[in-house]
């Protein structure tokens, strides 16, 4: 997390900050939160927690369960996140290219993601013809260590940064194929950096495969990633691997529009 400047602290309003911390808590928990949750997370007394929660609910950003008294994120928050995604300039720029990519692989899901601190966020997705849909929906956070997008978006960060991220986020095991060793992860990210391809072969979701490639800006920095993914019942791992040349071609075109010039 970036350090606050002196000016930021000078103009900071503590109550407003706590309200946003409560919303962050609700997002992180991904379920209803209680007064006790807020007390523990923010180190405030129950009376303050009650007042903060009810103030946010009165503003329409939390819904209160009349039976349990717990609070959950409201549809107003969903509208905010949807508007944020729709206003993302990168998302608007890449959509035509993602649609063309989907027409080449209609059985696959086409995804675009970005890194925001320790978080890997899906900001766009075109679903394949086949159902069911998987976890990758716009606005969702996915782990960095076992997804194709996570790997391409972190492969240039450096060993010390990756180790620190792993300590903060953990290397949770989702399937028998998930990388849970920091040494194995560092080797995998080095391969990702060298080949400019992030691979997820049943690491995050059982029987789901993904290939991802980076998008660069004019400074040669990775600013996003795009991927092709599908359940094995729709496309085999070999078919997902065969998508890589077209995937790279699409990413190169997007990077070129952003001003990137490969050496």
Can you say where each PLM-predicted feature lies in the sequence?
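N-terminal helix-turn-helix
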Residues: 2-87, 92, 252, 256-260
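Short, hydrophobic-rich beta-strand element in sensory/regulatory alpha-beta domains
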Residues: 107-114, 120-121
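Short hydrophobic alpha-helix segments
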Residues: 124-126, 226
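Short, acidic, Ser/Thr-enriched surface-loop or helix-capping motifs
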Residues: 66, 115, 216-218
């Amino acid at each position: 997390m970036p350090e606050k400047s002196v000016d930021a602290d000078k103009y900071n309003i503590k109550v407003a900050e706590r309200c946003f911390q409560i919303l962050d808590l609700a997002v992180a928990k991904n379920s209803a939160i209680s007064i006790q949750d807020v007390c523990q997370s923010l180190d405030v007394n129950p009376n303050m927690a009650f007042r903060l929660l009810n103030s946010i609910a009165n503003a329409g950003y939390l819904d209160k369960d009349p039976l349990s008294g717990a609070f959950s994120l409201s549809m107003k928050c969903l509208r905010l996140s949807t508007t944020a995604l729709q206003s993302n300039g990168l998302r608007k720029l890449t959509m035509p290219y993602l649609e063309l990519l989907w027409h080449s692989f209609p059985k696959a899901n086409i995804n675009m993601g970005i890194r925001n601190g320790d978080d890997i966020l899906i900001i766009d997705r075109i679903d394949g013809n086949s159902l069911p849909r998987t976890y990758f929906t716009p606005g969702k956070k996915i782990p960095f260590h076992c997804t194709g997008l996570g790997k391409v978006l972190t492969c240039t960060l450096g060993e010390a940064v990756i180790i620190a991220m792993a300590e903060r986020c953990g290397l949770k095991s989702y399937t028998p194929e998930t990388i849970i060793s920091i040494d194995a992860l560092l080797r995998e990210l080095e391969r990702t950096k060298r080949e400019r391809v992030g691979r997820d072969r049943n690491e995050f979701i059982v029987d789901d495969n993904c290939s991802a490639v980076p998008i660069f800006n004019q400074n040669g920095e990775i600013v996003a990633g795009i991927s092709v993914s599908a359940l094995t019942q729709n496309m085999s791992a070999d078919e997902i691997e065969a998508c890589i040349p077209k995937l790279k071609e699409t990413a190169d075109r997007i990077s070129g529009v952003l001003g990137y010039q490969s050496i």
